[in-house]
Amino acid sequence: MKLYNIVFSPTGGTKKVADCLTSALEGEVTTVDLTDSKLDFDSISLTKEDAAVISVPSYGGRVPAVAAERLSQVHGNGARAVLVCVYGNRAYEDTLVELEDAAKQAGFQSIAAVAAVAEHSIARQFAAGRPDSQDAAQLSDFAKQIQHKLSENNLTEPAIPGNRPYKKAGGAGLVPKPTKECVRCGVCAQSCPVQAIDKEDPKKVDDKACISCMRCISVCPHAARKANPVMLSAVSLMLKKVCSERKECELFL
């Protein structure tokens, strides 16, 4: 059995959760980076003997559209899938059911699902430092239960919470822009999952293409990209009430 780590993780939180799970599962791991716009996703083909951990962040309670679109190009061919949604301690709403549908359309059989918490990608004070050691222990335990199901080739589908039709997707509200510290090194443009940043002039941003993933902020070696501080403060204030209380990881088998 080959194990595929199929992950969309612009700021690294989702990948940390995915790695906690895949490192505790059996099989040689092949990583498929759904943020890589240069990758030929149509060339990725699994078999029914394989398993995949498919992980995405929750953006406003939905799967990021670009992640769903790239996953649709992958050929699951009956491979078993563990669905993972990672959220910033607010709520994941319809993310898991949407991911379940996207995985099914790509030819995967969903046998388990996990909802986990990682540091909020925009308001980073919420769920700061997560996944932490407590999460890692919990995810490792989840992986053991998932491995048992994989070893038995148990193909029963988990009961996943969420709504169909899904909630309405929100637009990108925060578009990071360069500060005067920008040296036009181009790291942000190379790393942007949707190529919203001009490669010739990283100070130019396509506001309509941007998905507010905050990848450019997280990869900038000069800390020279920032979100609008007034808007960021408003978002933080709005999230404070719903994000402050610790939420735990969940397993659906």
Model regions: which residues?
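FMN-binding flavodoxin-like domain, especially the glycine-rich phosphate-binding loop
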Residues: 2-36, 42-173, 230-236, 241-253
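Iron-sulfur cluster-binding cysteine motifs and their immediate structural context
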Residues: 178, 183-211, 215-232
